[in-house]
């Protein structure tokens, strides 16, 4: 029992980060260990180059977009709390996440809505709150590469935007994006199991 509080002291603001992200103490300690391993020069923060060392991101077609999500507003570094906040979007939804939700508190970072918002931002390259045909095409190019012809990609982008675009403005808003994915199990598809 005493070891739990001594481990918490290793992570500055550990209890606050745990409450905000929903990670267990054990998961938070593992993430802190991973953060320190990525921070090879012991700077206390990570750069884009540090995150590019993560193999799963290096082979992910959206890896660069995911890495960018760690650096909001053009910042050049991410500290441990920021690192964990981004990763919290990928934390699987547990039964206790929905059972104990206080309506006065902010929605958990791993809620369906927050997972969808995170995914939406990966597509909304210019951050204007809409996914245009051009943005959809850019993301599709990243995801399929040369396996599909340019004409096929353009057709897929056109069809995807047309199917989701309910107001006819030629782009997909967050509300439209959410509606188009209502039948998808986003909670599980956007989850990475982190050992407890």
From Swiss-Prot:
CDD domains: EFh
Tissues expressed in: Expressed in malignantly transformed cells but not detected in normal tissues.
Outcome following mutation: residue 82 to A: Does not reduce calcium-binding
Subcellular location: Nucleus; Cytoplasm; Cell membrane
GO cellular component, one term: nucleolus
Chain ranges of the EF-hand domain: 26-61, 71-106, 111-146, 152-187
Signal peptide: none
Location of the motif Nuclear export signal: 137-148
Chain residues that bind Ca(2+) 1: 124, 126, 128, 130, 135
N-myristoyl glycine lipid attachment residues: 2
Residues with the Phosphoserine modification: 27
Consequence of substituting residue 176 to A: Reduces calcium-binding. Inhibits calcium-binding and cell membrane localization
UniProt-annotated binding residues for Ca(2+) 2: 165, 167, 169, 176
SUPFAM superfamilies: EF-hand
Domain of life: Eukaryota
Pfam families reported in the protein's UniProt record: EF-hand_5, EF-hand_7
Role, per record: Functions as an integral cofactor in cell pH regulation by controlling plasma membrane-type Na(+)/H(+) exchange activity. Binds to and activates SLC9A1/NHE1 in a serum-independent manner, thus increasing pH and protecting cells from serum deprivation-induced death. Also plays a role in the regulation of cell proliferation and tumor growth by increasing the phosphatase activity of PPP3CA in a calcium-dependent manner. Activator of the calcineurin/NFAT signaling pathway. Involved in the cytoplasmic translocation of the transcription factor NFATC3 to the nucleus.
Family statement drawn from the similarity comment of this UniProt entry: Belongs to the calcineurin regulatory subunit family. CHP subfamily.
Name the record gives this protein: Calcineurin B homologous protein 2
């Amino acid at each position: 029992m005493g070891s739990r509080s001594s481990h918490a002291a290793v992570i500055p603001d550990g209890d606050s980060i745990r409450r905000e992200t929903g990670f267990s103490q054990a998961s938070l300690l593992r993430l802190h260990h991973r953060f320190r391993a990525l921070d090879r020069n012991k700077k206390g923060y990570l750069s884009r180059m540090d995150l590019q060392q993560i193999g799963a991101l290096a082979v992910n077609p959206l890896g660069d977009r995911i890495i960018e999500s760690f650096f909001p507003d053009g910042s050049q570094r991410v500290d441990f709390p920021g690192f964990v906040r981004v990763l919290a979007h990928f934390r699987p939804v547990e039964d206790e996440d929905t059972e104990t939700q206080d309506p006065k508190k902010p929605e958990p970072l791993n809620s369906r809505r927050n997972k969808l918002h995170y995914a939406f931002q990966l597509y909304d390259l210019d951050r204007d709150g809409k996914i245009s045909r051009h943005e959809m095409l850019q993301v599709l190019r990243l995801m399929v590469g040369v396996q599909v012809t340019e004409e096929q990609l353009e057709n897929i982008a056109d069809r995807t935007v047309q199917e989701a675009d309910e107001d006819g403005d030629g782009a997909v808003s967050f509300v439209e994006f959410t509606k188009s994915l209502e039948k998808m199990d986003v909670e599980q598809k956007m989850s990475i199991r982190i050992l407890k």
